[in-house]
Amino acid sequence: MFFLLALLTELGRLQAHVGSEGIFLHVTVPRKILSNDSEVSERKMIYIITIDGQPYTLHLRKQSFLPQNFLVYTYNEAGSLHSESPYFMMHCHYQGYAAEFPNSFVTLSICSGLRGFLQFENVSYGIEPLESSARFEHIIYQMKNNDPNVSILAENYSHIWQKDQSYKVPLNSQKKNLSKLLPQYLEIYIIVEKALYDYMGSEMMAVTQKIVQVIGLVNTMFTQFRLTVTLSSLELWSNENQISTSGDADDILQRFLAWKRDYLILRPHDIAYLLVYRKHPKYVGATFPGTICNESYDAGIAMYPDAIDLEGFSVIIAQLLGLNVGLTYDDITQCFCLRATCIMNHEAMSARGIKIFSNCSMHDYRYFVSKFEAKCLQKLSNLQPLHQNQPVCGNGILESNEECDCGNKKECQFKKCCDYNTCKLKGSVKCGSGPCCTSKCELSIVGTPCRKSVDPECDFTEYCNGTSSDCVPDTYALNGHLCKLGTAYCYNGQCQTTDNQCAKIFGKGAQGAPFACFKEVNSLHETSENCGFKNSQPLPCERKDVLCGKLACVQPHKNAYKSDIQYTVYSYIQDHVCVSIATGSSMRSDGTDNAYVADGTMCGPEMYCVNKTCRKVHLTGYNCNTTTKCKGKGICNNFGNCQCFPGHKPPDCKFQFGSPGGSIDDGNFQKSDEFYTEKGYNAHWNNWFILSFYIVLPFFIIFTIVIFKRNEIRKLCNRENTELIHPLYQKAMMWNINIAQNFRSK
């Protein structure tokens, strides 16, 4: 009788506080398979559970998404902020799969019993401990959402991103044009408003447990991108909301963005989300797509409808974060997910079973991070050592236990080298995927270009290193290096000038405007002219920051600007027609607003723009001096090493006859006391031979012609002399003969 009462109480709690429409299936006692290796057993675990009488073997691997400094913030009745560190929750999160269903995902917390999700091909289960049980009993229930019947995103925020689709690429584009996905980390700061706090249990640890569970599932989804979603901290508005949460999602977003700028400035995060409970919301969220690293727009609102459970809510957050990192919603006629629901599908929040990102999402993300480097995602992780997750064969990413991964059947370009079903190499081939793998399944030789330079002064070509089928990480000049004859600075691999920025927006011929235009445009208290926002109000630039606020351009033709810019502002100042665009009317794909001067643009002697302020240039991040470290024969790159000029050998740019230059980071370097690389040495000897041949040959031809002409002239002169002397010689001979004859006659 007591057991039945406890079971009914537990089901009532699930129904009331999780929003689940789950169907109770079974009570199970999970059985842990012990390992003799204590270190391995801490990283990997195996549990056996039963669902409806059928045993399932869960292979789990430790999942790290809570940083060491993770805190939970709450407010007391007096409005004072307090923080706690739930340290016990930080080391008990795992993800994996069920051996009986290889195409499955399992995300569990084992802090106090097993709690989490089991996603099979077309069904999802939730598992939670039966807290009143003394026999480690758990309940397993089938997850089932009602259709929330709400729109995905507020229109006036989704359209901002759609005006600039330059980041989109055709689905049949070559993978070799996309850089390899390196491990990246996205820090999300979560705030739970009062209504959702009450809906989830109205108790700090219970709500914290549910939010951590949701982010754990979101992190599992993003492992496809090698992107770890970390919950930097959690804030609970347990007594009262700090801002009004009335109105639609887009209205709340504006208020939240203003509040965030004032109160979260010292708390580390890449993006902050406010989670709001709304029984029947018009939209499930609002955010600024493609703005993950833009401090002016790094926020979002996620609505929790009454009709969904924690799994469905995790999909909503994953979709919103997907928009932040450059994804778009899937076109079901072109995008597919093998035996799974596509996360960026509009129906995903109510679907059951395993969910993955589609081929379209993979292309969107790979292109976004390769062309518009999301620098904030490339920081060092503050996590405990993150153990490798289960590899996903066919996602185009070479992961642990994979010999190759050329994508799915449609994408794979190395079918004779790599088995796209098993991600194993065929036969004795050397490689089966990557830009440094040849069509003959061999590694490209050292020095083969694999990523071309996109800026002649600030970005460098990368080469295959001869040991990997992947291209080395991108190398470029350290931020602050002078370019364009000392009139501009390199920043994130580009020579940043207002002329280049204006030409990209308004077309060929457009240039950066004179100072008078910048001064006028950035000194007014209007929504279209400002140096950022504070409390949702436009912020005029200080005089020192005038050249770092709104971008001002001049152009030769009035209507020369590109058609995708719909909001253009004209000003007539000191005989100049100054042109700018309204804030938010055109977003760069790296998350910054085209309306503003790009970071790294020169704003004075040894000064450049950073986040709309003019700052002193510092070659930050590394102790690299071109004069001492590179001996004046190279420049510093983004890894703090010397990028040597041709004829000088890295790492310290010593003179080396025949060296192509470069750095130890660009892939074309091979340690040797004598030569840079055999290929580079031989190649440059060949180049010198060819160059010498083409230099000497013309001189040889000219010399031969001169000698030939000189001989011709000499012969001609001799013939002329002979012709002049010969008649006189004949007369002299005749005279001598006549004398002789006369002498004889006498």
From Swiss-Prot:
One Pfam family it belongs to: ADAM_CR
CDD domains: ZnMc_adamalysin_II_like
Annotated signal peptide: 1-16
SMART domains: ACR (SM00608), DISIN (SM00050)
Transmembrane segments: 688-708
GO MF annotations, alphabetized: metalloendopeptidase activity
Keyword Membrane: yes
A Gene Ontology biological process term: proteolysis
Topology feature Cytoplasmic, residues: 709-746
PANTHER family: ADAM A DISINTEGRIN AND METALLOPROTEASE DOMAIN, DISINTEGRIN AND METALLOPROTEINASE DOMAIN-CONTAINING PROTEIN 18
Name of the protein in question: Disintegrin and metalloproteinase domain-containing protein 18
Gene that produces this protein: ADAM18
